[in-house]
Amino acid sequence: MAADVGAKAPDFTLMNQDREPVTLSEQLKKGPVVLAFMPAAFSGTCTTEMCTFRDSAAELDKMSATVLGITVDTFFALGAWRKAENMNMPLLSDFNKDVIRAYGVVNPDMIGLHDIAKRATFVVDTTGTIRHKEVLEDARNEPDYGKVKAALASL
């Protein structure tokens, strides 16, 4: 079942690029969270998306928001990608695909790659409630950053 606006966000723990566990409910104690699901590390649009969030860090910090980038890549690949692009947010490995299933963002076939993440963003408030959701069927498109920021500003 897909996670929808107004529903409780499925909690999860995933390993970050440094092989450290990151739990959504723990992150929410610090402020709202943007979950940024992406098809693949090092791909063009995914890099543009994460670098856009990176470059918005000051604005997001003012809203006490944390961005968590999530792909099905290994934490080894995510660590190399984070370093190569000088990213400041945690990148999480959903290698076993449990979280993309819980959020309903599994792409069954993208140019021959099976069961990777669709490009999707969720804004989760500090109570764990989903306040914004955007799932893109075309992975070449970027999320609507303005709507993400508007959802955060409304909290």
List PLM regions with ranges.
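Chalcogenol-based redox active-site neighborhoods
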Residues: 1-155
